[in-house]
């Protein structure tokens, strides 16, 4: 006998011999089937087969990773049974990372409005009309960008004992929105998670969209042919970037400023010389107290054929390009079958920086430059500074530097892909940056080229300073007085004003100035100005605004008074009044910033 009626016609009466379902479970099953059919009968439009219509709208949104921005105030997740979002009670999640019942179609349409690097010129131009930087995404979209890191294939936090409701198969329209969440000890939602006690975690594995952006940036700073191909993806920016920047009422975005440097470099080097972070930097002696020994240092570098053959055994094979610049190329090196502590075999990755000799550079200056950079970087040992491992010569006679590999990419790409960072995430990176700068200054080293492109990130959010090609040793261990620096060094938006107007200056406030500009770039997604000179209207507006009661609008938008006061002090145009790194860390704002566990300073 089959119980056939209007509500359960498709559910036959089960016999105890075939099924062991209790009557209560069977009743719930029939009730769910009944409500499902009633929902279908009320609409002629069938939902996609991969969407569970019994899930409430808010839960459904969270399950598919469809986020809409609300407020940036953290709140407690009150539904511990929600396995699609944060599944444990007592976890904080910023509300701008939470879903607010968006429809599936509207979220897909919103995501389609974001620029894709592989789109045609016409579609790219249409997406770029509202902003000079068309690659900026909303803060919530930045969470979807990193969703690939949470898939079983790429996750570093997967658990074989995970028990969650199977997610529906993603369709072409929502493939970029699906967050595959696992029930780990620390539930993940996108790239940033805040716990109830105020601690947080970063998950910065690059996603496809971020990888495309990173590839385009590599091409931008590569040969002229590659730059031409990359420019085709952003025609509105390339059309007349100088006019665009001047006509815009807002300061230039990070990407627009980067594009301006690329175009300016094309004008300066029509043959397609690669760009560099160091602009108009004069030749100088890094180790002024040890100039005579710098030439002899090259004899300690690996040069024999036998040693070159040992490189593959020690560091593995070099593969894809990670970055390009005037110095040369950075490649990733993979060494397989590395024994781990648990006895299993794994792989280890390294970054290999290939030095290139400049056209107007003699062999002696070339050797001095690379050995000076290697000596400085290899002598610095800090959590927030990239570890330099080795210096050797390849088969072509080019010198190469081996460094640790940072899987999270660089801060520039992250900010451009996200549009801007919320304060908790930016504060964590900022405090790590200041810790690294304080350590450098204590060691008598000044970087002089701090910018988001030279700040690397691990997959778990540890910030590391890299590229010491322009760094200086301003004080040796046995010296009491510092050596003053001179010349203009670095990328123009981050160059301190004293570099333009003084022949000699203390290099330490120069790094602090750059850190202040970097923080504002993280929080606003824009550069404060093109250069800190009197002919720059944005810089002049800043000088005027900092003296007025209302302040300078971009800095005033930070809302927190403690933060604003420190940033104003870091960006003081008078160098000797500028706050130093230790004062930043000891300020009220500096003390209240909570770094992630992996970002805590370990010397």
UniProtKB/Swiss-Prot annotation:
Biased composition annotated in UniProt, kind: Low complexity: 159-171
Biased composition (Basic and acidic residues): 282-296
InterPro entries, A to Z: Kinase-like_dom_sf, Prot_kinase_dom, Protein_kinase_ATP_BS, Ser/Thr_kinase_AS
UniProt keyword terms in alphabetical order: ATP-binding, Kinase, Nucleotide-binding, Serine/threonine-protein kinase, Transferase
PROSITE patterns assigned: PROTEIN_KINASE_ATP, PROTEIN_KINASE_DOM, PROTEIN_KINASE_ST
Miscellaneous comment as given in the Swiss-Prot or TrEMBL entry: Present with 1030 molecules/cell in log phase SD medium.
PANTHER family cross-referenced by the UniProt entry: PROTEIN KINASE DOMAIN-CONTAINING PROTEIN (PTHR24343:SF558), SERINE/THREONINE KINASE (PTHR24343)
S-S bonds: none
Listed name of the protein: Serine/threonine-protein kinase HAL4/SAT4
Species, as recorded: Saccharomyces cerevisiae (strain ATCC 204508 / S288c)
Domain (Protein kinase) ranges: 316-590
EC code: 2.7.11.1
Similarity comment text for this entry: Belongs to the protein kinase superfamily. Ser/Thr protein kinase family.
This protein's record includes keyword Zinc: no
């Amino acid at each position: 006998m089959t119980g056939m009626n209007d509500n359960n016609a498709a559910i036959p009466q089960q016999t105890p011999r075939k099924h062991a379902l209790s009557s209560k479970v069977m009743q719930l099953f029939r009730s769910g089937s009944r409500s499902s059919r009633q929902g279908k009968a009320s609409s002629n439009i069938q939902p996609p087969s991969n969407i569970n219509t019994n899930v409430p709208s808010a839960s459904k949104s969270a399950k598919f990773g469809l986020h809409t921005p609300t407020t940036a105030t953290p709140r407690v997740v009150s539904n511990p049974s929600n396995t699609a979002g944060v599944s444990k009670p007592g976890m904080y999640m910023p509300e701008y990372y939470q879903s607010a019942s968006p429809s599936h179609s509207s979220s897909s349409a919103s995501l389609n409005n974001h620029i894709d690097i592989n789109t045609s010129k016409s579609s790219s131009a249409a997406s770029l009309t509202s902003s000079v930087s068309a690659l900026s995404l909303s803060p919530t979209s930045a969470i979807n960008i990193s969703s690939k890191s949470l898939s079983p294939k790429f996750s570093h936090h997967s658990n074989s004992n995970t028990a969650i409701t199977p997610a529906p198969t993603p369709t072409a329209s929502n493939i970029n929105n699906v967050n595959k969440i696992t029930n780990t000890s620390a539930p993940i939602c996108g790239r940033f998670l805040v716990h109830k006690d105020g601690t947080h975690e970063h998950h910065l594995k690059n996603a496809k969209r971020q990888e495309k952006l990173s590839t385009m940036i590599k091409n931008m700073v590569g040969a002229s042919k590659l730059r031409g191909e990359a420019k085709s993806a952003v025609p509105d920016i390339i059309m007349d970037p100088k006019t665009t920047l001047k006509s815009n009422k807002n300061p230039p975005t990070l990407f627009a400023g980067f594009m301006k440097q690329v175009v300016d470099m094309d004008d300066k080097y029509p043959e397609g010389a690669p760009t560099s972070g160091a602009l108009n930097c004069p030749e100088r002696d890094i180790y002024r107290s040890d100039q005579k020994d710098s030439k002899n240092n090259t004899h300690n570098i690996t040069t024999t054929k036998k040693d070159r053959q040992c490189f593959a055994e020690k560091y593995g094979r070099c593969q894809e390009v990670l970055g390009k610049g005037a110095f040369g190329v950075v490649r990733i090196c993979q060494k397989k079958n590395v024994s781990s502590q648990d006895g299993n075999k794994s792989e280890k990755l390294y970054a290999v920086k290939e030095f290139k000799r400049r056209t107007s550079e003699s062999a002696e200056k070339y050797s001095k430059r690379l050995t000076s950079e290697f000596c400085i970087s290899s002598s610095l040992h800090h959590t927030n500074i990239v570890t330099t491992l080795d210096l050797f010569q390849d088969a072509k006679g080019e010198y190469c530097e081996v460094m640790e590999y940072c899987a999270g990419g660089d801060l520039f790409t992250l900010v451009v892909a996200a549009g801007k960072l919320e304060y908790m995430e930016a504060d964590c990176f900022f405090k790590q940056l200041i810790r690294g700068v304080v350590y450098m200054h204590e060691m008598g080293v000044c970087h002089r080229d701090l910018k988001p492109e030279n700040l690397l990130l691990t997959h778990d959010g540890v910030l590391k300073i890299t590229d010491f090609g322009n760094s200086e040793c301003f004080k040796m261990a046995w010296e009491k007085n510092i050596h003053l620096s001179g010349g203009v060094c670095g990328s123009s938006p981050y160059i301190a004003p004293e570099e333009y107007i003084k022949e000699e200056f203390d290099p330490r406030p120069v790094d602090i100035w750059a850190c202040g500009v970097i923080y504002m770039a993280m929080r606003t997604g824009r550069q404060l100005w093109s250069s800190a000179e009197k002919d720059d209207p944005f810089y002049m507006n800043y000088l005027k605004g900092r003296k007025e009661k209302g302040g300078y609008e971009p800095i005033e938008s930070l809302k927190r008074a403690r933060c604003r006061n420190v940033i104003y002090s870091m960006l003081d145009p008078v160098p000797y009044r500028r706050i130093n790194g230790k004062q930043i860390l000891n300020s009220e704002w500096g003390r209240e910033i909570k770094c992630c566990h992996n970002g805590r300073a370990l010397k």
